[in-house]
């Protein structure tokens, strides 16, 4: 059976997903698209899915009889309503981050899915599908380095545009660490603090950059995450886990080591999409396979809620300078499997 998918949102990410669904992945095809900009929808159809029907309203796309599953890649504030509508129609839905723009919105989705009785939602956190992070988790879970005590992490971008704001360091950037570190350790956070080093001259006047986020988990693991979105030299993701008996480090992407003209060098990526391109393929294939098996296993609506609660606390900490509590509701048994 080929899974028939409708895509809501045909911007850069949406078109990239349409491309991989039609040209790279197996077991699915795009039969419907929608975008607030009709030209974007037409472009997606022209370039990647010539047989797909264009819908003027995303709700009509969700209700369409030939749409068996939905991808939501539209503007963030629209996600909650589309996901809730997909659940109401009993259709599996893959939603790019954020699941909703507030923790309360994420909880409404959780409650709707609980009421439905089966998992329908997968959130687009792709780092758990990265082979480097998977290898790191295997080491942690094996007990080889003992219990994790500390994590030292960094999320560095070459540069960001003028529209990037201080709180986006949390909601657009750190949100990936908030999800993947929770997954690595298998536990929730209890507090967050944000401190500001000396500001780089490369940051716009309204942006605090870099920032350091300090997190504590339920068991007492301490995490520091450097966010530096105008580092100039490239796109660089680091994660070092300090355990009782050793240290495990996220591997850098493979690159050719060059010795030339009395210098030794290794190229560093500059594009975040290039760094995790394989992970996007794996996560979406996992969604397709999960829908066909009627068993979704990827990041859940609860994971989206947990990341949103932690992000809200980090934004509060940006403003207060204090250690802010992270109060996550008790996880339902539905999401513990």
From Swiss-Prot:
Example of a GO biological process term: inositol catabolic process
InterPro entries documented for this protein: Gfo-Idh-MocA_inositol_DH, Gfo/Idh/MocA-like_OxRdtase_C, Gfo/Idh/MocA-like_OxRdtase_N, MI/DCI_dehydrogenase, NAD(P)-bd_dom_sf
Annotated Pfam families: GFO_IDH_MocA, GFO_IDH_MocA_C
UniProt catalytic activity: myo-inositol + NAD(+) = scyllo-inosose + NADH + H(+)
Known EC number: 1.1.1.18
Record's keyword annotation contains Glycoprotein: no
Gene3D superfamilies, A to Z: Dihydrodipicolinate Reductase, domain 2, NAD(P)-binding Rossmann-like Domain
Alphabetic keyword roster: NAD, Oxidoreductase
Gene Ontology terms for molecular function: inositol 2-dehydrogenase (NAD+) activity; nucleotide binding
Family: Belongs to the Gfo/Idh/MocA family.
Functional summary from the UniProt entry: Involved in the oxidation of myo-inositol (MI) to 2-keto-myo-inositol (2KMI or 2-inosose).
Subunit-structure text: Homotetramer.
Protein name: Inositol 2-dehydrogenase
